[in-house]
Amino acid sequence: SGYNVKGLFMQNWQNEPGEECTSEVDFKDASSVCDVLDIPLHRANFSDEYWDRVFKNFLSEHEKGRTPNPDILCNREIKFKSFLDYAFKIGADFIATGHYAKLIDKDNNRFLARAKDLNKDQTYFLHEVKENEFLKCIFPLSELNKEEVRQIAIDQKLITAEKKDSVGICFVG
């Protein structure tokens, strides 16, 4: 019983040679976590898809004087399409993400709902993801607050336990 877990690291931004690349630091952190948890780590590069389906839209909207939110498009177009498809190709039945959100099953439907930690709730960033794409998703942080998540990481001796929260837009770091 239980799950056969695989780690999957997604890279959405391709830095120019010589530019600082936080995704490499993030990949090393993910690799360290997977080593501690004794699970394999796969790496997927979605930078082309991200450029075409998220960043071009961001630039276009910005040129029109609007303030787009690339995280919403990244979730809709990359995390819950490209990432999901890739996960299934390598044998996944479900994906689990670190989003602070909850999924509720009712009357043969799956609904997005707010997480327990309202300060970290990410449902706004997920509101454009289609219901059918949530059918194969698990949000294990839905009933936890940030302090509980940090404590679990500390207890497991994960290198990311004290890592600063990400507050940037999706493609930066």
Positions of predicted regions on the chain:
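Internal nucleotide-binding/catalytic subdomain
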Residues: 129-173
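ATP-dependent adenylation/nucleotidyltransferase module used to activate substrates
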Residues: 1-128, 147-149
